[in-house]
From Swiss-Prot:
Keywords: Acetylation, Activator, Isopeptide bond, mRNA processing, mRNA splicing, Nucleus, Phosphoprotein, Repeat, RNA-binding, Transcription, Transcription regulation, Ubl conjugation. InterPro entries: Nucleotide-bd_a/b_plait_sf (IPR012677), RBD_domain_sf (IPR035979), RBM39_linker (IPR029123), RBM39_SF (IPR006509), RRM_dom (IPR000504), RRM_dom_euk (IPR003954). It holds the Pfam family RBM39linker. It is found in: Nucleus. The modification Phosphothreonine is found at T146. GO terms for biological process: mRNA processing; regulation of mRNA splicing, via spliceosome; regulation of transcription by RNA polymerase II; RNA splicing. This is RNA-binding protein 39. It comes from Mus musculus (Mouse). Belongs to the splicing factor SR family. Interacts with NCOA6 and JUN. Interacts with ESR1 and ESR2, in the presence of estradiol (E2). Interacts with RSRC1 (via Arg/Ser-rich domain). Interacts with SF3B1. Interacts with ZNF106 (via N-terminus). Residues 355-406 are annotated as: Interaction with ESR1 and ESR2.
């Protein structure tokens, strides 16, 4: 068996060598394949490793670059912030931008960047500051008119409603011409209207048409329109100054005033005629209201005369004023000049204790009142001194009373001698004698005679013959003040039926109260004999 095994081994040996060779070859191939595979794997690993390293390096580089960029950006931002802060500090005192809030800055930085925001802040800083007022547009002058030309285009309005506004007057007078300006005179303290105003027109031709609107109702109250006398006053004052210079101050008496009239109201009425030095309105110490009269001192006597001529009889608060001259100061008035001081009015006259007791005793005489015994004893101890003080005080009181009576009497006499302010209405006296007139229709004949005469000067829109008047009065209303002035100048002083006619102006409200139908009269009358 062993031989068989050996023979078989010998026979199979060459085949085993081949197999071994094949196996070795196969093994070598497999090893080479494995080596190749391992080499390829290692190469791929190396490639992957190199790629990953490169990626990591690139990432690191990018990170470093991004960090450097961020550092540069942060540095530039800090620099720009510091610059913007310094600029803001410079401009903070002048102007604070309304866009400096965090929302606006974040929006700008996110969208348009910080440099543009800085430019924007510059532009904003150059814009107008909120503390500077906007300049009003330059108004071009309508006309280069002198004060005299403006006065010729101005009318004076009186008896205005309390609630009237400049717009109401502008609308009312726009029917006769274009209105340039309306200036209402108001109280300085209460800001309420004083019932008077000045209306300036563009054209001079509108002034007579505006005067013709006298009597028309504005907000339910009939208005009085007159021409402005400022031009005449200014011309007279200039002529007087050129000839003889200023004549010095002049004092006027103003009486028959309403008790609610104040010094500011009088100043607003009299000041257009000239500069006023002082206004003294006599006040009642008990009620604190006006006594109804006062004194106004003008710096120029001519201005005072013009004010006297124009404002005597001027109706204020429903009552016609009485304006007159005040007599010159005498020695007696100069002796009592200390009574006119404001300091004396505030402090009074100091009589002392004894003087007050003696005055109390003098006032108690004749009244049945008894003064206390202690007061009587004190008076007996120093009777002579007390009597002297009371005598001095009585002299002062009597002197003041006589002066006030003399001043008021002279002022009333002067006021009575001056004609009142011209209006559309006037009264004719001595036109007839009711006791001797017996013919039928005699009043119609007188009416026709007056109408015929007045038609020569502008006509008549209302007439009334008072048949029961002992003075023979005839009341006439003309269409305008100019017509009334012409008629009064023609009729005053003329003789009619053996008597001299006297003509006097009647305030328009008084005339309307007497004859309500005359308020709506506008048609010119003609004689009935035709």
């Amino acid at each position: 068996m062993a031989d068989d095994i050996d023979i078989e081994a010998m026979l199979e040996a060459p085949y085993k060598k081949d197999e071994n060779k094949l196996n070795s070859a196969n093994g070598h191939e497999e090893r080479s394949k494995k080596r190749k595979k391992s080499k390829s794997r290692s190469r791929s690993h190396e490639r992957k490793r190199s790629k990953s390293k490169e990626r990591k390096r690139s990432r690191d580089r990018e990170r470093k670059k991004s960090k450097s960029r961020e550092r540069k950006r942060s540095r530039s931002k800090e620099r720009r912030r510091s610059r913007s802060r310094s600029r803001d500090r410079r401009f903070r005192g002048r102007y604070r931008s309304p866009y400096s809030g965090p929302k606006f800055n974040s929006a700008i930085r996110g969208k348009i960047g910080l440099p543009h925001s800085i430019k924007l802040s510059r532009r904003r800083s150059r814009s107008k500051s909120p503390f500077r007022k906007d300049k009003s547009p330059v108004r071009e002058p309508i006309d280069n008119l002198t004060p005299e030309e403006r006065d010729a285009r101005t009318v004076f309005c009186m008896q205005l409603a309390a609630r009237i506004r400049p717009r109401d007057l502008e609308e009312f007078f726009s029917t006769v011409g274009k209105v340039r300006d309306v200036r209402m005179i108001s109280d300085r303290n209460s800001r309420r209207s004083k019932g008077i105003a000045y209306v300036e027109f563009v054209d001079v031709s509108s002034v007579p048409l505006a005067i013709g609107l006298t009597g028309q109702r504005v907000l339910g109250v009939p208005i009085i329109v007159q021409a402005s006398q400022a031009e005449k006053n200014r011309a007279a004052a200039m002529a007087n100054n050129l000839q003889k210079g200023s004549a010095g101050p002049m004092r006027l008496y103003v009486g028959s005033l309403h008790f609610n009239i104040t010094e500011d109201m009088l100043r607003g009425i009299f000041e257009p005629f000239g500069r006023i030095e002082s206004i003294q309105l006599m006040m009642d110490s008990e009620t604190g209201r006006s006594k109804g009269y006062g004194f106004i001192t003008f710096s120029d006597s001519e201005c005072a005369k013009k004010a006297l001529e124009q404002l005597n009889g001027f109706e204020l608060a429903g009552r016609p004023m009485k304006v007159g001259h005040v007599t010159e100061r005498t020695d007696a008035s100069s002796a009592s000049s200390f009574l006119d001081s404001d300091e004396l009015e505030r402090t009074g006259i100091d009589l002392g204790t004894t003087g007050r007791l003696q005055l109390m005793a003098r006032l108690a005489e004749g009244t049945g009142l008894q003064i206390p015994p202690a007061a009587q004893q004190a008076l007996q101890m120093s009777g002579s001194l007390a009597f002297g003080a009371v005598a001095e005080f009585s002299f002062v009181i009597d002197l003041q009373t006589r002066l006030s009576q003399q001043t008021e009497a002279s002022a009333l006499a002067a006021a009575a001698s001056v004609q009142p302010l011209a209006t559309q209405c006037f009264q004719l006296s001595n036109m007839f004698n009711p006791q001797t007139e017996e013919e039928v229709g005699w009043d119609t004949e007188i009416k026709d005679d007056v109408i015929e005469e007045c038609n020569k000067h502008g006509g008549v829109i209302h007439i009334y013959v008072d048949k029961n008047s002992a003075q023979g009065n005839v009341y006439v209303k003309c269409p305008s003040i100019a017509a009334a002035i012409a008629a009064v100048n023609a009729l005053h002083g003329r003789w009619f039926a053996g008597k001299m006619i006297t003509a006097a102006y009647v305030p328009l409200p008084t005339y309307h109260n007497l004859f309500p139908d005359s308020m709506t009269a506008t048609q010119l009358l003609v004689p009935s004999r035709r």
